[in-house]
Amino acid sequence: MAQTTTDTATSTVSGAGAASSFSGGTGTEAEFGSLGALSPTWWEPEDGSEPEPWLTPDQAFERFFEWTSDRGIELWDHQEEALMDLAAGDHIILGTPTGSGKSLVALGMLFMGMAQGKRCYYTAPIKALVSEKFFDLVQVLGRDNVGMITGDTHINTKAPVICCTAEILANDALREGEGADVGCVAMDEFHYFADPDRGWAWQVPLLTLPHTQFMLMSATLGDVTAIAASLEEHTGAACDLVVDAPRPVPLSYDYVTTSLEGTVELAMRRGEAPLYIVHFSQDAALATAQSLANFGIASKEQREAIKEAAKATSFSTAFGKILKRLLGCGVGVHHAGMLPRYRLLVERLAQQGLLPVICGTDTLGVGINVPIHTVVLTALTKFDGYKMRRLRAREFHQIAGRAGRSGFDTEGMVIAEAPEHEIENAKLMAKAGDDPKKLRKIKKKKAPEGFVTWNKQTFERLIETQPETLKPRLRITHSMVISVVEQGGDARARVHDLIETSLQTPEEKAKLEVRADEIFATLIDSGVVVRTEVPPAPDAPTDAAPDIDYALTVDLPEDFALDQPLSPFLLAALELLDPESETYTMDLISMVEATLEDPKQVLRAQERAARDRAMAEMKADGVEYEERLERIQDVTYEKPLEDLLDAAFDKYCQEVPWANDYQLSPKSVLRDMLESASDFKGYIQKLGIARSEGILLRYLAEAYRSLDRTVPIEKRDERLRDIISWLGFVVRSVDSSLVDEWENAGNPTALDAAPPQGIDEVVADRRGCTLLVRNALFRRVTLAAREHVRDLGELDDDWGMSEIRWQKALDAYHEQHEEILTDGDARSAAMFSIDESDEKTAHIWHVHQIFADEDGDHDFGIMGDVDLDATQDGGEVIFKNYRVGFIEDLLED
């Protein structure tokens, strides 16, 4: 059938704007959403009347069909077929192409389920996608009918429709089994079933929820007959495959030997924008964007429109300044290392049709809503964390499938660039033309040694090859076993059934059984689990075996096995610290950091810096080159308290065996920032990680959340309270979305609350802002003590203190004093002052930082005015009237 409303059915839930167009009206519709209002209510009517009875499957289908018709949506054949199968109680595996309306079918399933009184789940692999779907469903079904659970976020958890990560549902299935209140589940991005680390969470619900209806959807499923047969066997319901729908927008393919710049220019001339240029590293994406920015990508009208659309965005960070220039040229950048506000801006500009070109990574395949006409692959190989290899068919189709905008394009375009040596050879051949003599003289370039290459045949095979059959992944962990034991009864038998009925090979099942035996033995030996034989009833046959019951002897921590599984260890480990120690606060921070996920790009930068310092020191000490190379392998980033934490964790695991599923990772990121008195911008500059500032921000947001949520009040000294305030201030100022999301968790009114108006306070977080200023000024003291004049010039050139002026000031200082001290006294409050007298009227603080000298004269320092509005907007201190020198001279100025 034809799709009569432009792109509506294909983007009902996943589109940024389409879902909101389905809400509105007055009265009930405005409150619950236009579709949610058609379902019998799950809540007690306020007027005391009898609620409408639950609908039959046919009635629910009819209401959904009428709802789509009222909005001018004519269902495609495969959509109607899938919805009718769901109404009949069948499972559906929906493997139709990108843009073929899977989201609308999922919406229909969720509505029909809730209208029949069933609790429904929508699962996705990443929190960002769960959050996006949650807000879209709220618009259509109404805020009272939709909840969200993502480990660190709990909103309206009693709602009839729950959006959650796959692991949330899997853990519920293990904990509650057949008795779980799960009527139907729409599993998005089901190809994650084959993910080596996370695939278990997609398989477990299929094996443990026999009364649940499933819809499994992905554009790159491959052969799923084994999964369908397993689902039918476990549930007794039919499983229908809907996998042969045509692409709404067909794809054309081209393998090119032109340079990337030439390819883009030709595509633009042919009217094939917008283009998404796929790279397999963040650095490569930025390099291409910077190269293309000089090619006149955008028209004057587009540049003006981009400038207008982006004017509300602050580009205060180092990468932000780069991005602002690129966007002004019509070129976007999109990858996971960016701040959320920058990624969202690029997506919004793309959705408005303002960006002709986006340079990004292969994250294009999951969870971003960017309309694209042409996908350009810069390579057909990628580094998978272990080695360079060619793309798999599923990876290729995930990326290529995003080309073509339904309702806008008659076709989508997928272009693959040849390897560099092949492009060079093509240039030589073109230059030689048809001259046989010149052609014979050509010395063709070869691929570099060890280079994993590709060619046109590689591209054609990827186009023709169906996605690989999903390889099932099941694992057995302490956490999973604990969850199964929570049900009571014979938990070991249930784990055996889980393994035996899985889709793993016989060899894999045997290994999993051995692993399960080991875990049960560990849990029983440690006293966490007890195994009891219950004698048969008196009237049972004489040969009846006793029933087996497994039970927990401990209370599990709240949110067990969710997003912060090591929080209980952290609470126990804090007892090892001496509150009277000078290093107490920093050591506590190191313990928190050891429980957080590694920000790998940041740690790699730390390791590079540590090795550079070590190499310079060894060279200065006269160590031979070969020995330097050998020794440098042992140098890595700082790991505070590593020995103490390792010993404590080993002991903890003996008492809490499920902790063996996880591992500590000592590191010093937040601690290093604090000890070097760095703000966000300064730390990025120090490590040279401008392209990974989003990674650093997410890490700091997690550290803030852990410090604020997990560390007991009685363990917080004054300094730690200051640090928590400062950290929250920094994260909010740089990009508030990461903190706001979890702080609003559990508060449904936050979804439609207006922003606060008329706040009298000039400074929203006085403690945090004060520490930000103190750290910024003491960082300058530290740099001055180390004679890092160039760094000082880079920090302060905007306020008139260039490198040359700093050098003159320090030369004058050293004529009077030997050194600049940076000990505890030098950092104390006595050496720093704030005059807040002009805060209300001028929105400035007058600040003064004294340099501590060996004679105790305290006659040299920094004075300046802090622009409070700009500082709070950007998360870094913005100065006015900034000066450095002897106090007498500064006061005269």
Regions picked out by a protein language model, each given a short descriptive name:
Residues 1-84, 88-92, 297-328:
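Helicase-associated low-complexity/disordered flanking segments
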Residues 2-5, 9-21, 332, 351-352, ...:
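Non-catalytic terminal extensions of ATP-dependent helicases
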Residues 158-174, 329-343, 349-369:
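Conserved two-lobed SF2 helicase motor
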Residues 254-280, 287-290, 344-353:
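Conserved interdomain hinge at the start of the Helicase C-terminal
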Residues 374-377, 381-383, 389-430:
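Conserved segment of the helicase C-terminal RecA-like domain
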Residues 852-893:
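Compact beta-sheet-dominated globular domain cores
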